[in-house]
Design a protein with these regions (language model features):
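Surface-exposed amphipathic alpha-helices with a cationic face
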Residues: 15-26, 84-88, 187-195, 223, ...
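Short, acidic/polar
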Residues: 37-52, 121-130, 210-222, 292-299
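Aromatic-rich peripheral "rim/lid" segments of glycoside hydrolase catalytic domains that contact
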Residues: 16-21, 69, 132, 143, ...
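Boundary/entry segment of secreted carbohydrate-active catalytic domains
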Residues: 11-56, 60
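Bacterial Sec-dependent N-terminal signal peptides
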Residues: 1-11
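Aromatic- and acid-rich polysaccharide-binding/catalytic face
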Residues: 55-59, 146, 194-203, 216-247, ...
Length: 363
């Protein structure tokens, strides 16, 4: 089948054409990708690859607080505006990735910040973001919060210093019911100032039960307060060997999460799919096979749920690359370093064409 794609022409068997020609509901089943700002509007091979394959885009980090409003009096909309212009020009559907999240500025992470300073900065930034995207024709979804809960089910909070992965917004405090004020405030702002945009509660991790129970409890709490939560996102940074895409009980729990969303009139979004390695050889046959199986299992799970509600999948980066440190040391995606499509990408296309719903585990 892989050779079939090679010999039959990439354009005919692009993801967007497979979805259209195979009868998928194009208003409730989306497959897209993210690529780096450095490749945008430069007639680059990466940009051309994206446009040839996809019509669903998540701009990488251009809409986050750390970029747009990192400290009082400082605003920078240039990258955000460039992505919006690109999306509108090419008739793309966009999910804005600018959540209130740990990806915050050093100013926000500074240990001397007060609750009042953090709340003011958050309100200024998020209100303006919502106002700007509300009437953009390309923008369909936005991430409102991200990475709110640790794997053990506790709220993700601040750490000493300003260089760690931490969530400074939790310092604003908990309300009388024990929920972070920033989460509630973020959804209040989004509901008020972005009524035309679907609101997503994005999250990371694997399929840790305590973590997801806390997230679902929070969503129910928000809804009971009359706030709109239109979708749940899972980043899906998959691990090699024992990642969620390779473990039956985790895939079953993923299926449960999607069912829960659809029963609660919410969409389910796989928001940042890629494959993380520690010391494994990124070019080894076994690693590439496990990545392919993982990706097949994720997309097959989404295909199986397409009749009950909205599902989307976004690849976080088109090109495989080195990681930021010892873990992940390497990050695999759907094209290799030479921009050749990977086995995992062809597995996704094969599943989409066949409408495959079978879960396959490594031997």
């Amino acid at each position: 089948m892989f050779g079939f794609f090679f010999s039959s022409g990439q354009e005919k068997y692009s993801v967007k054409n497979i979805l259209k020609d195979s009868g998928y509901a194009l208003d409730s089943f989306y497959v897209g990708a993210t690529f780096t700002y450095s490749a945008l509007n430069k007639n680059s091979k990466i940009e051309k690859l994206f446009l040839s394959e996809f019509n669903y885009l998540t701009p990488e980090n251009a809409s986050k607080q750390s970029r747009i409003h990192p400290r009082p009096g400082v605003w920078d909309w240039d990258r955000h505006n460039d992505w919006i212009e690109f999306a509108n020009k090419n008739n793309l559907t966009v999910r804005i990735h600018g959540p209130i999240s740990p990806q915050a500025s050093k100013w926000a992470k500074n240990d001397n910040r007060t609750q009042e300073e953090l709340m003011l900065n958050m309100e200024e930034y998020f209100t303006e973001l919502c106002l700007r995207i509300n009437n953009e024709p390309s923008v369909k979804w936005m991430d409102v919060v991200n990475e709110t809960v640790l794997r053990n089910g506790e709220w993700f909070s601040d750490k000493p210093g300003d260089s760690s992965w931490e969530n400074p917004w939790t310092q604003i405090g908990l309300n009388s019911d024990g929920f972070p004020i920033y989460i509630i405030k973020a959804f209040e702002i989004a509901q008020k100032y972005a009524p035309n945009v679907k609101l997503v509660y994005n999250h990371n991790g694997g399929m840790e039960r305590k973590m997801w129970e806390k997230v679902l409890e929070t969503i129910k709490y928000l809804k009971n307060k009359g706030l709109r939560v239109d979708g749940l996102g899972w980043q899906a940074h998959l691990r090699d060997k024992n990642g969620a895409g390779l473990v039956k009980k985790d895939l079953d729990y993923l299926s449960y999460l999607i069912d829960w969303c659809h029963l609660n009139e919410m969409g389910f979004h796989v928001t940042e799919l890629n494959y993380w390695l520690r010391d494994e050889d990124p070019n080894s046959i076994n690693v590439l096979k496990r990545q392919s199986i993982s990706y097949s299992n994720i997309i097959n799970t989404l295909i199986a749920k397409r009749g009950s509600g909205l599902v989307t999948l976004n690849h976080w980066g088109l090109k495989s690359k080195k990681g930021p440190g010892s873990y992940p040391k390497n990050i695999l995606s759907i094209y290799d370093n030479d921009l050749r499509a990977t086995q995992a990408f062809y597995s996704i296309k094969k599943s989409l064409i066949e409408k495959n719903t079978i879960i396959r585990l490594p031997k």
